[in-house]
Amino acid sequence: MNKGTSFTSSIDNTTYQFVTNQDLTISPQDGVYKFSNVNLYEGTLVTFRYTVDSTDVDQKFVIPSVNADTSTLKVTVQNSSTDTTLNTYTLASGLRSLDNTSKAYFLQETDTGKFQVYFGDDVIGKKLSDGNIVILEYIVTNKADSNGASSFTLSSSVGGFTDVSITTNSNAQGGAEPETKESIRFNAPLQYTSQDRAVTTT
């Protein structure tokens, strides 16, 4: 089952799209293909690309949609337009474990409510090179609107098959509105205080 395989579900006469967020492979048992515990994410899978331009000192790698689910974000860097080698970058969870070879990215919210991806400086995290292509893959959602969806229909195909039986283990949940500015103002000083240290000042 390919990443981005789509399903639909309806709530109050409104149809929502759900997609898979990873490739899944199984072997048939007695001629039957059965995927278990498949996670579906409400929304549309989107891919956005930036080409690194070292002459643009103000270049930023912004996720264009304010409704992007950053928990689904996958960041890869292609060497160049002629070298299609891909390197996966992971979200930095702290600074102490990073060095100049760490393929890590950082994430911050802009004043427009969109998120910006940025990278290391060859001291803390590996620095990007001119001509690198930054590939941002993520799901754009309808936030909390699809919570409660319980019946799903395959709207694409799986390995060429369209006659698929689906059993729902749990209803859709977890969709939420973005964090409010008031909440950000309250939490940001607390996060800044820790700064990845074991001891904070008081």
Short names for language-model regions:
Residues 1-202:
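Signature of Asx- and small-polar-rich beta-strand/turn repeats characteristic
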